[in-house]
């Protein structure tokens, strides 16, 4: 089933914090995107106001159910903004994570990365996630005992097919997140992100719009079907998943 998760806490070292409005979208078929914009960017953050962003298809993640509410997910991201931008001391390769369901309905994610090299010391991290109802306009907490919303939430995924770009848009219920990156650019000028919310009125509201080519990202998702093509300002996107 599709899922929309809001991050509540990020921790490296002894002091937890949360400086972002992070939402992660996971489609019914397992495609995913996580956008992590700063709430109050400052200084150098103003030019690229993101802690991080990553995305991938279900071919870039291995999911294993360990039982008792524990799942491991091993990621080889399609887009990793730190890698794309060649940020110093960035982990390269697979990221191994463990997800544990809490009785409250929150989900704890733990793992480790190797920013200084695979043969160097690891850096452990911890994140806490709250599933929210993607069929609602507001960020409504999902009760651990009532997930009927999941059967009604649409799950649509579009992937760019142009040789000059990589791109993915994931529609989960009313919430849309997407990225578009220029291949072989590797600067912030080559990155574009959107986060949209479909309101009760039927109109979509931009919660996040970043980049000079956001108009190449589709922003209408009606009358689609799997395998069809959507053209947005000259860029072709393929519908790789459609559950509505």
Swiss-Prot record:
- Its primary localisation, in coarse terms, equals cytoplasm
Record carries keyword Cell membrane: no
Tell where it localizes: Cytoplasm; Nucleus
In terms of Pfam families, this protein maps to: HRI1
Q: Which residues carry this modification: Phosphoserine?
A: 143
Q: Which UniProt keywords apply?
A: Cytoplasm, Nucleus, Phosphoprotein
Cellular component terms, GO, for this chain's entry?
cytoplasm; nucleus
What is the similarity comment for this entry?
A: Belongs to the HRI1 family.
Q: How does it assemble?
A: Interacts with HRR25. May interact with SEC72.
List the protein's name: Protein HRI1
Q: Which organism is it from?
A: Saccharomyces cerevisiae (strain Lalvin QA23)
């Amino acid at each position: 089933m599709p899922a929309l998760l809001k991050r509540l806490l990020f921790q490296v070292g002894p002091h937890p914090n949360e400086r972002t409005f992070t939402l992660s979208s996971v489609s019914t078929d397992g495609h995913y995107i996580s956008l992590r914009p700063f709430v109050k960017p400052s200084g150098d953050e103003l030019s690229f106001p993101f802690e991080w962003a990553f995305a991938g298809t279900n071919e870039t993640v291995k999911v294993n159910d360990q039982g008792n509410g524990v799942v491991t997910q091993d990621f080889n991201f399609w887009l990793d903004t730190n890698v794309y931008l060649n940020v110093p001391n960035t982990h390269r390769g697979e990221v191994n994570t463990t997800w544990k369901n809490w009785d409250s309905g929150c989900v704890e994610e733990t793992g480790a990365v190797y920013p200084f090299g695979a043969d160097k010391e690891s850096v452990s991290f911890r994140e806490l996630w709250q599933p929210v109802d993607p069929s609602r306009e507001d960020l409504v907490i999902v009760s651990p005992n009532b997930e009927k919303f999941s059967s009604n939430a649409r799950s649509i995924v579009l992937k760019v097919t142009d040789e000059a770009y990589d791109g993915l848009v994931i529609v989960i219920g009313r919430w849309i997140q997407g990225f578009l990156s220029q291949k072989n650019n590797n600067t912030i000028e080559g990155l574009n992100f959107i986060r949209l919310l479909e309101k009760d009125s039927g109109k979509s509201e931009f919660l996040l719009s970043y980049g000079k080519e956001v108009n190449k990202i589709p922003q209408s998702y009606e009358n689609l079907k799997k395998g069809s093509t959507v053209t947005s300002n000259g860029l072709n996107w393929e519908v790789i998943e459609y559950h509505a």
